[in-house]
Structures are given as structure tokens and as C-alpha cells.
A protein has these predicted regions:
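C-terminal segment of N-terminal export signals and the immediately downstream linker at the start
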Residues: 21-43, 50-54
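Acidic-and-aromatic substrate-binding clefts and catalytic sites of carbohydrate-active enzymes
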Residues: 37-45, 61-72, 94-98, 133-135, ...
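Acidic/histidine-rich catalytic cores of soluble enzymes
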Residues: 89, 158-255, 260, 308
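N-terminal secretory signal peptides and thylakoid transit peptides that target proteins
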Residues: 1-16
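Hydrophobic faces of well-ordered beta-strands that scaffold small-molecule active sites
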Residues: 31-37, 59-61, 86-91, 125-127, ...
Length: 309
């Protein structure tokens, strides 16, 4: 038995409650929305309750170690009591780092993240596929759209999934503007190539808007994403995008409701094709901005006939 398998076995008894929560809200016809939430101290009960008080029924994975069985048990139980699904375990490292030792370390980090997702009942563990850039762990590089990149990403995904052998969670690569997967079709090709049931899709439509053509056709891009990927989507990053007019093309992430993404379209497509996947707000500077984004999503959902609570 490998180290990851031993840890997962020890943690498994602590996490049975998570399975009963996973489909409860979806069966009631409601979507799950989440965002970063913090509370003083480290009480899982207080953190889970704070999510519900904010109107969220999905969460980013709390700070918990795979080898801390007691805290794992308390975290899973608290979030289950409050009907808050753990959407994702983020492991933001470069699986294609040019340095071999860093690559090895990063692969172990993501493998541990998938084991933690399995232990907590999170919908997925997510990372980007990586970058060949020597100066930025996520930055652009000519080879990031190459067959070599694709093959390396497939090999890494198989290695991570095969090490953990998850039964109730998935591993995903977040889509990117300048690295594979950079389109719905690229996601489908990667899912087919990895050929593992536990390899899924992490949807971030804003990350795919990398040209004026896609910016102007963003709603059709959103529809294409959900139409082609819907059943494979484990979690979704929800944000908005604007075009800062300069001498070169410059798209910028902004708070939902202040950009160009039609959330009426996005939420309707989400409800139709991927209702079980949590929608997670991200990349905002503080609580006030998250509260405003939350309100904008709920308002758009109301107009689209979609509810969250």
C-alpha cells in the first residue's frame, strides 16, 4: 500500500457524511454558489456556518491536512450538517516546471491534493496543466500549445489519478487562455486521451476569452462549453471580464456585473447542463466585492429562473 493509499484509508472513516450531501441540493433544483470565506480561529463548525450565513452552499476546501484524521472528521461533519459542499482542492503548482526536482515535488503536491479531495468529499482537485515557461509557473510559452505539452499533461493526469484511485472525486485541469486546454474541444481531447473516469473538467469561461472574436461571442462560447462539456464539469470559476482599450488587446477580470459576460446565459446553461457543479467566485479583493458579486449572480439567476437557496 502506498503512502497516499494509507493516508486515504485512515481518512476514509472520517468522511462518510460527505456522500449524503453531494446531491441533496441539486435534486431540489437549486444551484450551489461559493466564495472564499474566513472566520477567526480554526473551528470547522464556525466556518461552515459562516458560509451559510453568507448565502453560500459551496466552499473552497478549508485548511486541513490529510494526516490530521480528527480535523478531517470534524470538517466533513460540520460542512455536511450545514449542507455546504466542498467544491475543490486547489493545488496551484507547475507540473511542467523546467526543473526536474521541482516537477517531481509538484507532482507529489497535486497527488496529495487529490487524496485530500477524496478524503473530504470535494468535487475535485484542480491545477493548471502547467507551463514550460522558465520565469512564470503559469505564464505563456510557445510550447504550451504543442503536442509535447498535451502529451506531458496527459501523462501527469494519469499518474496523479492512478496513484490515488479516487472513487468519489475527480482531478481537473483548469482551462487557460495561453495553455492547453484552451477550448471546449481541447478539453474533450484531453479527457479522451487521459482515459480515466476520475479525470473531469474544470470550467472557467473567462479564461477562454483570449481574442476579440471570443470576447464578442462570449455568450456563444459559454453555450458551447456547457453543451459539449456539461456532464464532465466538476466545478466552475465564476467571474467577469472587461476590455481595457489600449494599443494592444487587454482583457481584465472584474467583479461579476461590471463586465461583459452575460450571467443570465451562463446560469441558464449551467442549470441545464451542469446543475451539480458548484459555481465559485474568485479573484476579488475583499468581502465587500464578494458580497456585490454574490448579489449580482443571484439577481441574474432570478431573471433566468435559477435559484441558489
Amino acid at each position: 500500500m502506498t503512502t497516499i493509499e494509507r493516508r486515504t484509508f485512515l481518512a476514509g472513516a472520517a468522511t462518510a457524511a460527505a456522500a449524503t450531501v453531494a446531491g441533496a441540493a441539486e435534486s431540489a433544483g437549486r444551484l450551489r454558489l461559493g466564495a472564499p470565506v474566513s472566520v477567526p480561529g480554526d473551528d470547522p463548525e464556525a466556518l461552515a456556518r459562516a458560509h451559510r450565513e453568507k448565502g453560500y452552499r459551496a466552499a473552497y476546501c478549508p485548511n486541513v491536512r490529510l494526516d490530521d484524521a480528527a480535523r478531517l472528521r470534524d470538517t466533513v461533519a460540520a460542512f455536511a450538517r450545514h449542507d455546504v459542499v466542498i467544491a475543490e482542492v486547489g493545488r496551484w503548482v507547475n507540473l511542467l516546471d523546467p526543473d526536474a526536482e521541482k516537477r517531481k515535488k509538484n507532482l507529489a503536491t497535486v497527488t496529495e491534493g487529490l487524496a485530500l479531495a477524496e478524503a473530504t468529499g470535494a468535487r475535485c482537485c484542480v491545477d493548471i496543466a502547467g507551463s514550460f515557461s522558465p520565469t512564470s509557473w503559469f505564464g505563456p510559452h510557445p510550447e504550451n500549445l504543442s503536442p509535447r505539452f498535451f502529451d506531458a499533461a496527459v501523462e501527469n493526469a494519469r499518474a496523479i489519478v492512478d496513484a490515488v484511485k479516487p472513487k468519489r472525486t475527480t482531478f481537473c485541469y483548469e482551462m487557460m487562455a495561453w495553455s492547453l486546454p484552451d477550448s471546449p474541444d481541447a478539453c474533450l481531447r484531453m479527457v479522451k486521451a487521459v482515459d480515466r473516469k476520475a479525470f473531469a473538467v474544470h470550467l472557467d469561461p473567462c479564461n477562454l476569452v483570449n481574442s476579440p472574436t471570443r470576447y464578442y461571442a462570449a455568450s456563444e462560447l459559454v453555450r458551447e462549453c456547457y453543451r459539449k462539456l456539461g456532464p464532465l464539469v466538476a466545478s466552475v470559476h465564476a467571474k467577469d471580464l472587461t476590455w481595457d482599450v489600449e494599443m494592444a488587446v487587454h482583457f481584465r477580470e472584474v467583479r461579476i456585473g461590471t463586465g461583459s459576460i452575460d450571467y443570465g446565459v451562463l446560469l441558464a446553461e449551467h442549470a441545464r447542463h451542469a446543475p451539480g457543479a458548484p459555481l465559485m467566485l474568485e479573484h476579488l479583493p475583499g468581502d465587500a466585492e464578494y458580497d456585490a458579486a454574490h448579489a449580482a449572480v443571484v439577481a441574474a439567476g432570478r431573471k433566468a429562473g435559477v435559484t441558489f437557496d
